């Protein structure tokens, strides 16, 4: 999937936070602490960022056949 721009439940803009969140978690920081520091406190918004899986690179490998 493509990075979520807004929370699916409440509509809060999240797209600008995703790259920072991803880099910090991959660097070894605790996801909950990163979200707290980014100001993401609602459960619905936290779920949107934590549960997101990037599949777009895997899907682009397949060709469309006519």
UniProtKB/Swiss-Prot annotation:
Keywords: Cytoplasm, DNA-directed RNA polymerase, Metal-binding, Nucleotidyltransferase, Transcription, Transferase, Zinc. Gene3D superfamilies: Homeodomain-like. It comes from the Archaea. GO terms for biological process: DNA-templated transcription. Zn(2+) binds at residues 7, 10, 44-45. Its main location: cytoplasm. SUPFAM superfamilies: RNA polymerase subunit RPB10 (SSF46924). Binds 1 zinc ion. The keyword Cell membrane does not apply. Pfam families: RNA_pol_N. Its EC number is 2.7.7.6. GO terms for cellular component: cytoplasm; DNA-directed RNA polymerase complex. It catalyses: RNA(n) + a ribonucleoside 5'-triphosphate = RNA(n+1) + diphosphate. Its cofactor is Zn(2+). It is an enzyme of class 2 (transferase). GO terms for molecular function: DNA binding; DNA-directed RNA polymerase activity; zinc ion binding. It is found in: Cytoplasm. PANTHER family: DNA-DIRECTED RNA POLYMERASES I, II, AND III SUBUNIT RPABC5 (PTHR23431:SF3), DNA-DIRECTED RNA POLYMERASES I, II, AND III SUBUNIT RPABC5 FAMILY MEMBER (PTHR23431). Part of the RNA polymerase complex. NCBIfam families: PRK04016.1. Belongs to the archaeal Rpo10/eukaryotic RPB10 RNA polymerase subunit family. DNA-dependent RNA polymerase (RNAP) catalyzes the transcription of DNA into RNA using the four ribonucleoside triphosphates as substrates. This is DNA-directed RNA polymerase subunit Rpo10. It comes from Pyrobaculum islandicum (strain DSM 4184 / JCM 9189 / GEO3).
């Amino acid at each position: 999937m493509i990075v979520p721009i807004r929370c699916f439940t409440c509509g809060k803009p999240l797209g600008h936070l995703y790259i920072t969140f991803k880099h910090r978690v991959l660097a070894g920081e605790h996801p909950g602490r990163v979200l707290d520091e980014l100001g993401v406190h609602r459960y619905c918004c936290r779920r949107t960022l934590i549960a997101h899986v990037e599949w777009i690179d895997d899907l682009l490998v397949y060709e469309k056949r006519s």
